[in-house]
Amino acid sequence: EPLTPLKLGGGNYEEISSLAYDPASPDRIWFSLGFGKGLFVYHRGGKTVDQIEPPADPGSSSVRALSFNRHGPQDGWYLEARTDDARWVLPLPAGGIDPPKNVGANPPKYVGVSPPKYVGAWKLIERIQDQVALPADKVSRMAAAANKYGIYVSSRWASGPRLKAHLDFLKAQGLNSIVLDFKDDDGYLTYDTKLEEPIRIGAVQKRFAIADIVQTAHANGLYLIGRIVVFRDKQLYKADSSTYAAWDKAAKGPWRYLKKSVDDLTGEETVFQGEYWVDPYSEHVWDYNIDIARELQDAGVDEIQFDYIRFPSDGDIGGITWRYRKPGMGKMEALESFLAKAREYLAIPISTDVYGYCGWARISNWVAQNIEMYSRYVDVIQPMFYPSHFPRDFLGTMDYLPRAKYIYEEGTKRSAYIVEGRSVIRPYVQAFRIGAETSFAPPVYSTYLLNEVHGTLEGAGSGFTLWNASNDYYMVTVPLGPIISQGAEAVR
């Protein structure tokens, strides 16, 4: 309980952005939380935590580094704090931390933690301007990709009356973009490709003509985003005797993620392969997908969206050996190498999808999704902040509907903070129900979706994409256009 400020629930914790032992009192450890979530002192003996008034308004600046210094051996210690844009010093009173005094307005509150304590006046030492100017082409791509609001459309819905229904929906809602599968979750190219390799391995299922879909999108004033599922690819996995498949080191064959299904009537159990993963270290796999992206670019698609830029997360992943891994290359380096190469060949904006928690916090040792690194090469990050996919006890003290808004608002802010202006943040909005959400009545699920949208807008996201794998956007029950145009003040 003393470290309540660290706990988010569901086994998740806030990031500690800096830490320093107090030389005047070894019992005290000073630490700050990332994303402007506060400055604290932990008293090891009493196992208590004091919240300290930070050198800037809570939430407006993060303390990135703490250190103790003094001018001479007989002088008193002072605390130095490096925030996002400045250096500050704080002389420490000889008697220790003072009782609460002038603590400012609306400080963060934590269960079992004292209100912020006034320990003296922070003194500004210098302002720091670390922001590096972005290259002109990067600025141009980000501007082209900004403020895009749309829906995901499966390739099976990309022609005829089904496509028309989606176009009518987009127009009625005041939306201006569409994400369309050009290489789907099974590894099939869904258009009339001219590329020899996908044709040779049987990885083409034409569902529309690329020239037609580009013309139709642009005629309707839509920004067309071409989705390419990269490292999850059943067709390339099977091609050429599984030459490029993730490899099972024990079975000495293609690695398989096996799942079970049970027949509700007979109880019969069936085992099947759930996902097919190719080797993210393989340069052939990189080139195969980059060639597809280049073909889309040449055909007039406005943006390339790479999905599944990660390593597998489920199954016996410890049993995988990566046959194309070069000495010294880790998972993050593999993904970075792919994105760096893609950037060389693509002049249009690149976006990539990431797990919601990978946009909420800096993590890279799980599936190697690291948006700080991604943002050096891509122009748009699309975190999937689906509230249903966070553990229920994550922010578990909040009611479900306000929690949905907070996850999107806070997550969008955190993602923007992590990438430091190098990428647009355009979250995927959960437009489907799962688990307990399936019992929501229309007014409830409508509020749920609107809360997500408002969270994105109030978190300063630059657009959003509604996601429903079945392409049924029934959760949208009020026009989104006015909400988007009026921003966060439209509906409360």
Which residues make up each language-model segment?
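Short loop/turn segments immediately following the C-termini of beta-strands
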Residues: 24, 34-35, 44, 71, ...
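Substrate-binding cleft of secreted/luminal carbohydrate-active enzymes
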Residues: 378-392, 400-409, 414-491
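Catalytic domains of carbohydrate-active enzymes, especially glycoside hydrolases
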Residues: 163-188, 298-303, 377-380, 458-464
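Short coil-to-beta transitions that initiate beta-strands within beta-rich domains
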Residues: 7-24, 54-73
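Aromatic-lined carbohydrate-recognition surfaces of secreted/lumenal glycan-active proteins
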Residues: 152, 223-233, 305-312, 331-367, ...
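Conserved beta-propeller blade signature
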Residues: 28-31, 76-81
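Short loop/turn segments that connect beta-strands within beta-propeller blades
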Residues: 43-47, 93-95
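Active-site-adjacent "subsite" loops/lids of carbohydrate-active enzymes
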Residues: 141-158, 231-298, 447-451
